[in-house]
Amino acid sequence: MNTRFLDACWGKPVDRTPVWLMRQAGRYLPDYMRVRSKCTFLELCKTPELAAEVTIQPVDILGVDAAILFSDILTPVEPMGMALDFVPGPVFEHPIRTMADVEKLRIPQMEQDVPYVLETIKILRRELANKVPLIGFGGAPFTLACYMVEGKGSKDWATIKRMMYAAPEVYAALMEKVTMMDMEYLNAQIKAGAQAIQIFDTWGGVLSPSDYEKFVLPYTTKLINGLNRQNVPVIHFVKGAGTMLDTVKKAGGDVMGLDWHTNLGKARDILGSMAVQGNLDPTVLFAPNDVIEKEVKRVLDENGGRSGHIFNLGHGILPTVPPENAIHMVECVHRLSQQ
């Protein structure tokens, strides 16, 4: 098996920089759209054979060094008692607003409530056995709570911020419950065979550094400390956290995911020996081949040859990117970083 990705997570030297892409199983791939055209998004997530098929597609098409489970961060929230739909984008019919709402939430029994996720992982471990490692993932407690309180996506997340300030006891009770659920969910993925875990805190960066430290850090730290992570590296990705990496680092984890607003070299200086993942601007993949190569080289140069770097985009690949551009990017990473 290609172990470059896992080796880099642990800061070990590798013969070339490993690379994978957030949302690498997605709408930019015609093969994905062929599968997706036959079912809804939720049906795809809940059908292990299909979820496994689309997980493997980018490994074969792009030549990436890791696969990431095809699912959605809100998958384990639905069995807490929150009806979820995608219309498009996630929408919860009854958002959490009061302590009574929080008290109604249940902690799912993962093997009974999300068996399709665990079965997908088991299928993938068999099918990827001689290829690449499998990354499991979940949303960070704060990002999950954002959707649960707002009921859908938001530009400013004012509803959950108002709860933080005006009803801190409700916010704390919700975050405790979501953190416990998250811990159970990610540990179930590890038990099923996930070889690494990525925690996505997509909205952590909407807070000030002091609010992040007060309202988010304790829960993410508790989550990471509660994972059964012997030989399973944890990647912590907080979008928009470039100005507070020293604070985010306190949560623990083995790899810091970086978005494209952060200079990778400066981030490494702040993070010390901690491995990093990132951080090409996703829109670079619309550029001509020579520009893609130049930008890949820039990111590699910012790393300065230090071990413990996994190449990735600074956020998910965009749906209208030409697949051949993503293939070219992966090839450039491998060729330019070859030792």
Curated annotation (Swiss-Prot):
Cysteines paired by S-S bonds: none
Site feature: Transition state stabilizer: 72
One Pfam family matching this protein: URO-D
CDD domains attached to this UniProt entry: URO-D (cd00717)
Gene Ontology molecular function terms on file: uroporphyrinogen decarboxylase activity
An annotated GO BP: protoporphyrinogen IX biosynthetic process from glutamate
Family designation: Belongs to the uroporphyrinogen decarboxylase family.
Protein name per Swiss-Prot or TrEMBL: Uroporphyrinogen decarboxylase
Organism expressing this protein natively: Geotalea daltonii (strain DSM 22248 / JCM 15807 / FRC-32) (Geobacter daltonii)
